[in-house]
């Protein structure tokens, strides 16, 4: 790694204070975030390959001693339980809450959402007539896409958000879909004897800790010839928790509450094959994620006043609280762009893996 471009020295509290008061423009914000991310890269990259392997293996072994999931409740309440109208005003048409796939330079966010869903179906080898389970289904974009494309598939979404369950079921009814179910449950606590032909896990691994326990649980829902498709954000080389590196790291703890987010390396899930075997493995360049969050930011800025009005009732009419939520969403978008566009998208990216049951 080269030298890090220095920024104005101030405490994490001072930086956050200026951010929340609206005193940091996007240009400065990008520089401040890049500084923290470059420190992360210097921390994560080791001087020899053996040292890198040992560093990663120590991290992987530490996960096996933890509980299944991180402390995601605060993040869920802050992000996923926002009013659906807020997502409609800031995200794409299907309100996909993870990275999209931009086939062309001219692709819109709506087109990138659909291309992403198409890619998932292709790589998961979904065929008409199968039973499909989407873990952490969000607003149901993928559930509804699969249900419409494969009329004889029965598609089940699983989410711990009541708001999301209600939205998906209403959309399925509007579309006349009778092949959609949604389960309201925490995946780490949910138990069922039912099995599925395909299991999709998009943007969930990032909120897990003990991957061994998580994949073991998923394997119990896999039919004999089932396939498990996983997509997760990652760094290409090293693993890390998205937590503050030092007392000056204002960014990591602001984006995710402590214990909430895990970024594996692109190949770390290959160390968790007790109950499954890898069939295929891909990476998606980080620029796709960067373009996704940049599109979200632009749409949010365009609809800013409407979003404020949507958020205000749920926050007790507190304008300061509304501004706080919007600042957090915008900072996530700006930060995601900086992070996933570093080195032309070849640092942080998305890994996609296909597993079969052992």
Curated annotation (Swiss-Prot):
One of its GO terms (molecular function) is (S)-tetrahydroprotoberberine N-methyltransferase activity. S-adenosyl-L-methionine binds at residues 98, 136, 160, 164, 186-187, 202. One of its GO terms (biological process) is methylation. The active site is at 333. It is found in: Cytoplasm. The keyword Methyltransferase applies. Gene3D superfamilies: Vaccinia Virus protein VP39 (3.40.50.150). Pathway: Alkaloid biosynthesis. GO terms for cellular component: cytoplasm. InterPro entries: SAM-dependent_MTases_sf. Disulfide bonds: none annotated. Its EC number is 2.1.1.-. It catalyses: (S)-stylopine + S-adenosyl-L-methionine = (S)-cis-N-methylstylopine + S-adenosyl-L-homocysteine; (S)-tetrahydropalmatine + S-adenosyl-L-methionine = (S)-cis-N-methyltetrahydropalmatine + S-adenosyl-L-homocysteine. Keywords: Cytoplasm, Methyltransferase, S-adenosyl-L-methionine, Transferase. It holds the Pfam family CMAS. Its main location: cytoplasm. Belongs to the CFA/CMAS family. PANTHER family: PTHR43832, S-ADENOSYL-L-METHIONINE-DEPENDENT METHYLTRANSFERASES SUPERFAMILY PROTEIN. N-methyltransferase with a strict substrate specificity for (R,S)-tetrahydropalmatine or (R,S)-stylopine. Homodimer. This is Probable (S)-tetrahydroprotoberberine N-methyltransferase 2.
């Amino acid at each position: 790694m080269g030298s890090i471009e220095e920024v104005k020295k101030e405490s994490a509290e001072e930086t956050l204070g200026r951010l929340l008061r609206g005193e940091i423009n996007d240009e400065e914000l990008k520089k401040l975030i890049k500084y923290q991310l470059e420190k992360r890269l210097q921390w994560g990259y080791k001087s020899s390959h053996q040292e890198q392997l040992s560093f990663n293996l120590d991290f992987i072994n530490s996960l096996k001693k933890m509980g299944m999931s991180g402390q995601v409740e605060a993040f869920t309440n802050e992000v996923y339980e926002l009013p659906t109208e807020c997502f409609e005003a800031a995200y794409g048409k299907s309100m996909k809450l993870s990275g999209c796939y931009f086939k062309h330079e001219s692709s819109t966010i709506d087109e990138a959402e659909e291309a992403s869903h198409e890619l998932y179906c292709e790589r998961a080898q979904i065929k008409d007539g199968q039973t499909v389970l989407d873990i952490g289904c969000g607003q149901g974009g993928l559930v509804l896409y699969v249900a419409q494309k494969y009329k004889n598939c029965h598609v089940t979404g699983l989410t711990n958000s009541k708001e999301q369950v209600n939205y998906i079921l209403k959309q399925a009814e509007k579309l006349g879909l009778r092949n959609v179910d949604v389960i309201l449950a925490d995946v780490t606590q949910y138990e069922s004897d039912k099995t599925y032909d395909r299991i999709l896990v998009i943007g969930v691994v990032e909120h897990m800790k003990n991957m061994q326990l998580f994949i073991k649980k998923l394997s119990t829902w896999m039919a004999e010839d089932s396939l498990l498709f996983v997509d997760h954000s990652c760094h290409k080389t090293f693993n890390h928790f998205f937590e503050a590196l030092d007392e000056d790291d204002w960014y990591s703890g602001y984006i995710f509450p402590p214990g909430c987010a895990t970024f594996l390396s692109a190949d770390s899930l290959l160390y968790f094959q007790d109950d499954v075997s890898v069939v295929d493995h891909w990476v998606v360049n980080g620029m796709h994620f960067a373009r996704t969050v940049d599109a979200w930011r632009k749409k949010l800025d365009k609809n800013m006043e409407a979003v404020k009005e949507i958020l205000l009732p749920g926050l007790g009419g507190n304008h300061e609280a509304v501004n706080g939520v919007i600042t957090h969403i915008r900072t996530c978008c700006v930060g995601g762009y900086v992070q996933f566009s570093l080195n032309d998208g070849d640092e942080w990216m998305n890994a996609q893996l296909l597993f079969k049951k052992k």
